[in-house]
């Protein structure tokens, strides 16, 4: 890794692309960031075997693409990072043949790293209006549940990740209301799911859904 980093720094320093960027008064490309590298392939069962279900995904980022390959999840193409309506339509269509589909939306995290609280708020509102509104219009909420959460928190004040708990919402017409009215950290504390570990999110959500969905659906 160190040798790769040293060579990449030298190559980028002499790159004609950086010369053009410098001439245009733009910042140079100075480093290739390597993170979360491993030295062996994870020994994990395919997710369909773990849960006896058909899982699939819509993901854009390299880490999530890697996870989907390791877990042998079918990946659906659904436009670019901000093609929220397309992602919602593809997800809804996929539910005709799949039992569950994981959709990873990157947007709010970027605003957190930039320390842009207003931008983060507006992006979450945009996702709500464009992705979830489209998704709800294309699924039967009497038969399909939606689980919303985050893989980590990115407080704008930190401009980085933190270990603060993130809210989780399990919603569907057949899911009993536990008194919460909004998806916020404060409301999540009052919810019936309680505080759980990230590794338990899928199992906890599936158990809740299976316990409340009508047997004939």
Please annotate each region the language model reported.
Residues 1-217:
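Feature captures the catalytic ectodomains and active-site-proximal regions of enzymes
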